[in-house]
A protein has these predicted regions:
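Intrinsically disordered, low-complexity serine/threonine-rich segments
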Residues: 9, 22-25
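Compositionally biased P/S/T/G-rich terminal and signal peptide-adjacent segments
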Residues: 24-36, 82-107
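C-terminal motif of bacterial Sec signal peptides marking the signal peptidase cleavage site
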Residues: 16-19
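Non-cytosolic coordination micro-motifs
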Residues: 24-78, 113-199
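Sec-dependent N-terminal signal peptides
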Residues: 5-14
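N-terminal secretory signal peptides that target proteins for export/translocation
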Residues: 1-2
Length: 199
């Protein structure tokens, strides 16, 4: 009897050990194979993710880098910038159309580089080119999603609490036109408090 109990306990410990060491997180909608990078970039044009930066400083800093602030497209937390001299600008050796900044209060939370097209095939080609460039620097974590508006998505997770998400997705413009976006978003959890589950 003791021998059977010992075997049962060993079997349960083995199952628990195996399930705890899995790198996959599974839900009904998505599966994520997690890979962590030591650090993901957190500074862009002199602005650091997670830092408290007033709106006027963000606007002046980016204007000095050749961008203009699209006030008519921005809100208090979502700031839209475009290149002053042409339709495109470069970052990381790649060409982009749009730069969007997200903040909560005065804390800089994310920086989004984005391109837009009406053609899914060319957007997926752009996605794959960006993916190859980013993966020369970071190891990916790929997510499988059932969201029909997302054609491809890859995460780059940093132990420094900064992550990047590369996505190719469908969206509708204000004028009700369907577009395909390709975005590279750097975002942080710095300064965010864990959710409190107390009532």
């Amino acid at each position: 009897m003791k021998n059977k109990m010992f075997i049962l306990i060993c079997l349960l410990v083995g199952i628990a050990f195996n399930s705890c060491n899995s790198n996959k997180t599974i839900s009904s909608k998505e599966q994520l194979d997690t890979v962590w990078n030591d650090k993901v970039q957190d500074s862009f044009y002199g602005l650091v993710l997670g830092n408290t930066i007033p709106l006027a400083v963000i606007v002046k800093t980016l204007e000095n880098q050749g961008f203009y602030y699209g006030r008519q497209y921005s809100s208090g937390e979502n700031l839209c910038f475009r290149a002053q001299q042409s339709r495109y600008f470069t970052f990381g050796g790649l060409t982009w159309e749009m730069l969007n900044i997200e903040r909560h209060g005065d804390v800089l939370n994310s920086v989004c580089f984005m391109n837009s097209s009406i053609d899914k095939a060319s957007s997926l080609g752009i996605y794959n080119n960006i993916k190859a460039a980013v993966e020369a620097k970071y190891s990916p974590s790929t997510i499988i999603t059932t969201d029909t508006t997302v054609y491809a998505r890859t995460y780059y997770l940093g132990r420094n609490r900064v992550c990047a998400t590369l996505s190719c997705f469908r969206y509708e413009t204000i004028g009700r036109k369907i577009m395909i976006g390709t975005s590279l978003v750097y975002w942080t959890k710095k300064g965010k408090k864990a959710a409190n589950d107390e009532l």
